[in-house]
Design a protein with these regions (language model features):
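Short functional hotspots at interaction and active-site rims
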Residues: 1-188
Length: 188
C-alpha cells in the first residue's frame, strides 16, 4: 500500500488538474445534526437531535478542478447496477475526451462495464491506492457538503434534496481548486 501511495504521489505533478475527475459516493440521512455548538459562557449548549426512524440515501458526484459535476441522489445504498446507471445516464454525458476519471477501490467501481462506459467517451480510468482518502479531493468537498447539511437539519428526503441543492450551489471554483491543492494536485 505504501509503495502504491509513493508511486501515486510521484506521478501527481505530471497530471493536468483540469482533466482530473474524482468520483465518489457518500451517505446522507434525515437525522444529520450539527456535531458542535456554541452558547453563552456558563450556559449549556442544547439542541434537539432526531432519534428513531430516519431515511437514508446515497449521494454520488464528480469533482472537477472548477466545480462539482454530475450530482446524483438515490434513496438507499449504491450497488453495481445503480453505479453503472449513474455513469451511463449522468456522468458520461458530461465527460470530455482526455479526461482522467479517478475512482477509489470500491468493488462496484471495478466491474468491467465501468471501464467500458468511461473509455467509450474517450476518457481514461485510474484507481486510487487502497486506503488513501487523503489523495481524493472529493472527500474534502463531501466534508463541506455534510457540514452544510447538518446545519440545515433536513428531516425529510424532500427537505434533504433542497438542502443538498442549496449546498451544491454554494460551491465556488475557488473551493474546488482549494480541495485539489490540499490533496496536492497543484497545477491549478
Amino acid at each position: 500500500v505504501q509503495a502504491a501511495r509513493v508511486l501515486w504521489r510521484q506521478a501527481q505533478p505530471q497530471w493536468d488538474s483540469q482533466r482530473l475527475v474524482f468520483i465518489d459516493e457518500t451517505g446522507l440521512n434525515t437525522k444529520m445534526a450539527r456535531l458542535y455548538g456554541r452558547s453563552p459562557t456558563h450556559q449549556r449548549c442544547v439542541a434537539s437531535v432526531p432519534h428513531g426512524h430516519w431515511q437514508s440515501s446515497t449521494f454520488i458526484a464528480a469533482l472537477r478542478a472548477e466545480s462539482i459535476a454530475a450530482p446524483f441522489l438515490i434513496k438507499g445504498a449504491v450497488n453495481a447496477e445503480v453505479f453503472t446507471a449513474y455513469l451511463a445516464q449522468v456522468l458520461c454525458p458530461e465527460l470530455r475526451r482526455g479526461d482522467v476519471v479517478v475512482l477509489d477501490n470500491l468493488s462496484t467501481h471495478k466491474i468491467a462495464s465501468v471501464t467500458a462506459l468511461i473509455t467509450a467517451r474517450g476518457a481514461t480510468v485510474r484507481y486510487l491506492p487502497p486506503y488513501s482518502p487523503d489523495l481524493n479531493p472529493i472527500e474534502l468537498a463531501f466534508a463541506k457538503l455534510k457540514a452544510h447539511l447538518r446545519q440545515a437539519a433536513a428531516r425529510t428526503l424532500l427537505d434533504l434534496q433542497g438542502a443538498l441543492a442549496d449546498s451544491l450551489a454554494s460551491f465556488q471554483p475557488a473551493h474546488c481548486q482549494g480541495f485539489f491543492r490540499h490533496a496536492r494536485y497543484a497545477s491549478i
